[in-house]
Curated annotation (Swiss-Prot):
One of its GO terms (biological process) is DNA-templated transcription. One of its GO terms (molecular function) is DNA binding. The RNAP catalytic core consists of 2 alpha, 1 beta, 1 beta' and 1 omega subunit. When a sigma factor is associated with the core the holoenzyme is formed, which can initiate transcription. HAMAP family: RNApol_bact_RpoZ. This is DNA-directed RNA polymerase subunit omega. Belongs to the RNA polymerase subunit omega family. Promotes RNA polymerase assembly. Latches the N- and C-terminal regions of the beta' subunit thereby facilitating its interaction with the beta and alpha subunits. It comes from Ruminiclostridium cellulolyticum (strain ATCC 35319 / DSM 5812 / JCM 6584 / H10).
């Protein structure tokens, strides 16, 4: 079974699109050198970002211009 599950992640966001954007933006920050905030054995930035979302380490703010 995949952890975290999509059902668990969907409780953290309002849509799958938001989840994809939030994970992609955080993964980009990690690639650019940001410190990871979740305990994760993976070296893959997208996996780390997904785990951070699941552990409520990061969140998003919806503005008129997009997700911040």
């Amino acid at each position: 079974m995949i952890y975290p599950s999509i059902n668990e992640l969907m409780k953290k966001v309002d849509s799958r699109y938001t989840l994809a954007v939030e994970a992609a933006k955080r993964a980009r920050q990690l690639v650019d050198g940001a410190t990871k905030m979740a305990k994760c054995d993976s070296d893959k930035e997208v996996t780390i970002a997904i785990n951070e979302i699941a552990e409520d380490k990061i969140t998003y703010v919806r503005t008129k211009s997009g997700i911040k």
